[in-house]
């Protein structure tokens, strides 16, 4: 190869690498706020050291004219779990609050959205219809980008000293999993600081109910790549995990029964495992008066046995099915809370499961 041509190729490669690095560093998911949004803030408003970093997530406030209860929706904790992010987008782009305050973080792990999912070959962006034509939904990695944090330890250890149940000592990457790092530390790793900022938001805004929207593998039979034996996946799919507080468990049980009856799907619920430290549903509820929940929908992209999963239009588990369930569950929890408290969150213009199954997601995205 001629020296001049070699220099040109090396220069082009350097430009591509720099461009990719810059893209990851400055990437923010596309959020198009509706008229109901009162203001936008940042996670760093609750913990200043996050300002200007790739862990500083946008926060959207949808506030009613009448005071009432404050509730939080967390989407995008794991950027590969696309239904939670999309459901949070629909709230930001459609919801109007009449009473109380709704606080939404559509893309909590903004760092993870800046990189490709490290466990699959699923595309970074997925084109979907919307009211203005088409838009791209992002698909990233479940953890914070390595470049935004120091090297992983060999074994992850929660700030309490606990290790992950069943750990074999090779799970150090979980140090970059926001949903293993609650309640967080003000002077900890960037991931711990992001979790700490969420806790500070919960406390300072006097949040009474929070839901963290996630996805799991699908309830399907397949063969293990390691053992070759058949197994049934998706234990967590269609699961509402409730903080063990009596009120949270009672609210969760009633919500699961009501939503199951309406949508014709057998949903499940269980209490947080107190030995599994760092998860939002356990730690948020234990560290505050908030009733904290986590809801899992089945995502084909979580199935290790699928060669080319379709995370948007899968025949059995399409995105509108999963987003509809996330919103149906959240709204049911809100309604049940309102029935037993004097302070309420009252919303309108939030699509339910039936509407999204009929309309698809396009009519509800700006």
Per-segment meaning from a language model:
Residues 70-76, 177-181:
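Short glycine-rich or small-residue beta-strand-to-loop segments that form or flank ligand, phosphate
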Residues 64-70:
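Proline/glycine-enriched tight loop/beta-turn segments at coil->beta junctions
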Residues 11-20:
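Bacterial N-terminal signal peptides
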